Amino acid sequence: MPSLKDLKNRIGSVKNTRKITKAMQMVAAAKLRRAQEAAEAARPYADRMAAVMAGLTAAAAGSDMAPRLLAGTGEDRRHLLVVMTSERGLAGGFNSSIVKLARLRLQELQAQGKQVSILTVGKKGREQLKREYGDLFVNHVDLSEVKRIGYDNARAIADEILDRFDNGEFDVATLFYNRFESVISQVPTARQVIPAVIEEGEAGASSLYDYEPDENAILNDLLPRSVATQVFAALLENAASEQGARMTAMDNATRNAGDMIDRLTTVYNRSRQAAITKELIEIISGAEAL
């Protein structure tokens, strides 16, 4: 049985921890609002970009002059996995869910005899994947000094992906990130960005237009922007998901700390009561002996 002093110290320690988790919950809630607004504001732009791209690619896809970002290399042998996680922990299963999805995809590709390389964004994903697949890493993007995700950050990542594609390092590139649904729901998502994937419904709706100059000329300019837009949207979705996951995790931690304080306080009171009762019995016994 722990002493009263030990119990009192432990109660104080848990109370201090609860203050920290409560403060982190409030900070995450404030950041979540801004991150959610940014992610939701970017969605219409990304959707419109996809619709424009659909109309252009519907006409250009069958052309011998179709850009490589659309037509691909003609092979499906080398894959680049771009895994986006957070720079900080204490976010529940946010990072592990993305890493799990990326790991499953990696194992599936390797089982098919494909060549896989990994580019990580965020320290936590790098830490988890490098233990097993360190030899597959081509680079790591550090965003620890970035206070607020901007398009410039996405463009830098997209430029590296495009440069590696132009250098013939891979045939297919896929983004792995968490899509923000709500505070308690973040969906691990895999999205292929190279070669471009166009939904049939979007293509049918936009293929009625004629474009000047021709579709291929416009695509040569828009496809790199489309990659950057998709990377930017993924970063924003990931940022909102991270804050939602951290807010939920810290709320649960605060509640658990409160429950532990209640249990420890009950044990402390019972131990204190038992100690007082024992002292009274000793006093009474001593008085009777006299």
UniProtKB/Swiss-Prot annotation:
Belongs to the ATPase gamma chain family. Its main location: membrane. It is found in: Cell inner membrane. Produces ATP from ADP in the presence of a proton gradient across the membrane. The gamma chain is believed to be important in regulating ATPase activity and the flow of protons through the CF(0) complex. F-type ATPases have 2 components, CF(1) - the catalytic core - and CF(0) - the membrane proton channel. CF(1) has five subunits: alpha(3), beta(3), gamma(1), delta(1), epsilon(1). CF(0) has three main subunits: a, b and c. Keywords: ATP synthesis, Cell inner membrane, Cell membrane, CF(1), Hydrogen ion transport, Ion transport, Membrane, Transport. This is ATP synthase gamma chain. InterPro entries: ATP_synth_F1_ATPase_gsu, ATP_synth_F1_gsu, ATP_synth_F1_gsu_CS. PROSITE patterns: ATPASE_GAMMA. The gene is atpG. It is a peripheral membrane protein. GO terms for biological process: proton motive force-driven plasma membrane ATP synthesis. The keyword Ion transport applies. GO terms for molecular function: ATP binding; proton-transporting ATP synthase activity, rotational mechanism.
